Amino acid sequence: MTSIAKAFVEKAISNNPVTVFSKSFCPFCKAAKNTLTKYSAPYKAYELDKIENGSDIQAYLHEKTKQSTVPSIFFRNQFIGGNSDLNKLRSSGTLTKMIAELKENKSSIL
């Protein structure tokens, strides 16, 4: 893990309402991005298999979140988990509320 990877992740999650660290070939990543698109979530996806330092970024994400797989999804600076966690939020109705709060620029998301 490099300080470049740490800086990249921290800047990404600070600058985007929703950040998804993904891999282009991952079906769970695709499903998560499809869900976020369906709910009109303002998200930015970073394809770790397509960007420089992708493996270092994934190593830092593992250190930060204790999750070694992708997708890694953040709402503002709050790690919410992967696709199954996103689906739990969707099923409970919480995802709709979280996205509405993001769009209203509320600072409290969860």
Curated annotation (Swiss-Prot):
Transmembrane segments: none annotated. GO terms for cellular component: cytoplasm; mitochondrion; nucleus. Residues 6-106 form the Glutaredoxin domain. Keywords: Disulfide bond, Electron transport, Redox-active center, Transport. GO terms for biological process: cell redox homeostasis; cellular response to oxidative stress; removal of superoxide radicals. InterPro entries: GLR_AS, Glutaredoxin, Glutaredoxin_euk/vir, Glutaredoxin_subgr, Thioredoxin-like_sf. GO terms for molecular function: glutathione disulfide oxidoreductase activity; glutathione peroxidase activity; protein-disulfide reductase activity. The disulfide bond functions as an electron carrier in the glutathione-dependent synthesis of deoxyribonucleotides by the enzyme ribonucleotide reductase. In addition, it is also involved in reducing some disulfides in a coupled system with glutathione reductase. Thioltransferase catalyzes cellular thiol-disulfide transhydrogenation reactions. It transfers reducing equivalents to cytosolic protein and nonprotein disulfides. This is Glutaredoxin-2. It comes from Schizosaccharomyces pombe (strain 972 / ATCC 24843) (Fission yeast). The lineage of its organism: Eukaryota, Fungi, Dikarya, Ascomycota, Taphrinomycotina.
